[in-house]
Amino acid sequence: MAKNLSAIKRIKTSERNRLINRKYKSVVKTLTKRCLLNIDNLESDNFNDVQSSISQVYSKIDKAVKKGAFHPNTGARKKARLARALSFAQKNRID
């Protein structure tokens, strides 16, 4: 256990930040899974639901990047994978 005051403060700060980052990551994972399920069940009548869920995931990813829970490249990669999944689903639905 740390003895000097600055080390004790750093332990408290890092634990607080770890919990905050974990919350952001958990929310992004949950929303991403929900969005991918919506994309898998894509039909013409629920396209607006898919668009709203994707915009919600994009918003949460951007907030997580802004707060430092994700590296900017990680956030961009997650958004690109969602966009690619939607694009493939739309192409397969049309064909």
Curated annotation (Swiss-Prot):
It is found in: Plastid, Chloroplast. The keyword Kinase does not apply. InterPro entries: Ribosomal_bS20, Ribosomal_bS20_sf. GO terms for cellular component: chloroplast; small ribosomal subunit. GO terms for molecular function: small ribosomal subunit rRNA binding; structural constituent of ribosome. Keywords: Chloroplast, Plastid, Ribonucleoprotein, Ribosomal protein, RNA-binding, rRNA-binding. Disulfide bonds: none annotated. GO terms for biological process: translation. Transmembrane segments: none annotated. It holds the Pfam family Ribosomal_S20p. Its main location: plastid. Gene3D superfamilies: Ribosomal protein S20. The keyword Oxidoreductase does not apply. Binds directly to 16S ribosomal RNA. Belongs to the bacterial ribosomal protein bS20 family. NCBIfam families: S20 (TIGR00029). This is Small ribosomal subunit protein bS20c. The gene is rps20.
